């Protein structure tokens, strides 16, 4: 019962992670955030691997999934520090998120709750084929939305890591017990064959 509840809980957390990652992937695509898109793709693959390992009793897959979650927590911690401009990090260095391929920023910058976008005409700051906008009236600025999204990912990852370690430990213990029982049964099964063969041989020759 405990094993089943652990597996079911891990699958539930993996499904929540998958939904949250897909939701984040959509908005990162809309904002052309190529670095987060790549990280989200790897995370989705790792979560699918974790679900498969849980359902198929594969402890190695769960270990790989848990190892990825450590990297995923570190990445999301970096995202939080980046958008909140902790230390030397600054949003002006947005080439980190776009691999310096565009000037796009987070989709939430213009589409956040309550945001009003106003084009700034004849601005000297505008580059070629680009325009400057003014965003006002946001109920929650986009850096905080991105930080909250990353905090949710960290929360799910921490719980997933704990349950992945627990379930993989249960699977490893079961594999060891099955190997021991299987070896003992195979050894005990050969002895009756030899004795029965010795008992039947005289009966065959006398007939």
Swiss-Prot record:
GO molecular function: ATPase binding
Origin superkingdom: Eukaryota
Cytoplasmic side: 56-61, 168-207
Positions on the Extracellular side per record topology: 22-34, 83-146
GO terms (BP aspect): regulation of sodium ion transport
Membrane topology recorded in Swiss-Prot or TrEMBL: Multi-pass membrane protein
Signal peptide: 1-21
Compartment(s) where it occurs, according to its Swiss-Prot or TrEMBL record: Cell membrane
Transmembrane stretches, start-end: 35-55, 62-82, 147-167
Disulfide linkage: none
Subunit: Interacts with ATP1B1 C-terminus.
Family stated for the protein in its record: Belongs to the NKAIN family.
Annotated protein name in UniProt: Sodium/potassium-transporting ATPase subunit beta-1-interacting protein 1
Organism the protein comes from: Homo sapiens
